[in-house]
């Protein structure tokens, strides 16, 4: 009897796995797209179609080198990298996926072309909130400085307080903010303590009442990952300037 139920359970898992994998794919691509466009009216199949048409990706190592296969010779797929598991590794041992969005079609641009063809760069991030993990996709415009949009998520932040990071109200505050200052130094974006702050500069967003620790977690997460991605960003910002100056 035990063997029978064990076999039945195994078969059930095998049957459900493709469904679960498809749901994970939809959820991942939904979050990535959600950082750059409004996806509220898109059903799952439209999300997949839009993603496949308008997005390409690349995976880097800590030295900003493109990596395409792992140590076992298997292809590395950006969308399949588990950012949570990746986060547990030392920064120099992680993989860093980057997603590039084109408002026309992914067939019309190459991964290594910048400025003229890539509308937005999306960077996945992971960190800690008050109670559990927080994560996000932060999109930069083609200047690789201005925030196009963000899509934050969390596991267990306090409802009505830290959990607000996943709301449009909070996420919209990040739009048009700058991560570099006029000297080209990485400043990142800081969520201020408290809400309804009167003085907010281009590197700051208004805070959330009663959620200082969650806000601090966001600040640390964003700064840490942009520090890791900074080599790639600086290189592609330079390429973008060169391409623009030639036109």
Predicted regions and their residues:
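Flexible, solvent-exposed loop/hinge segments and secondary-structure transition points
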Residues: 1-247
């Amino acid at each position: 009897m035990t063997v029978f139920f064990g076999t039945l359970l195994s078969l059930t898992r095998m049957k459900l796995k493709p469904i679960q994998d498809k749901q994970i794919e939809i959820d991942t691509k939904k979050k990535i797209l959600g950082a750059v466009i409004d996806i509220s009216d898109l059903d799952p199949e439209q999300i997949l179609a839009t993603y496949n048409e308008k997005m390409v990706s690349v995976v880097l190592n800590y030295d900003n080198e493109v990596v395409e296969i792992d140590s076992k010779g298997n292809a590395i797929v950006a969308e399949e990298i588990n950012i949570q598991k990746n986060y547990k590794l030392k920064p120099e041992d992680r993989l860093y996926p980057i997603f590039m969005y084109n408002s026309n079609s992914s067939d019309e641009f190459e991964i290594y072309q910048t400025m003229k063809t890539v509308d937005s760069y999306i960077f996945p991030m992971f960190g800690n909130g008050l109670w559990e993990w927080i994560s996000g996709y932060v999109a930069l415009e083609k200047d690789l400085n201005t925030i196009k949009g963000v899509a934050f998520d969390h596991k267990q932040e306090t409802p009505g307080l830290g959990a607000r990071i996943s709301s449009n109200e909070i996420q919209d505050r990040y739009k048009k903010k700058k991560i570099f200052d006029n000297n080209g130094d990485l400043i990142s974006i800081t969520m201020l303590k408290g809400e309804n702050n009167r003085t907010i500069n281009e590197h700051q967003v208004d805070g959330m009442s009663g959620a200082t620790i969650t806000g601090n977690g966001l600040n640390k997460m964003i700064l840490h990952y942009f520090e890791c991605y900074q080599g790639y960003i600086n290189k592609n910002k330079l390429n973008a300037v060169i391409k623009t100056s030639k036109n």
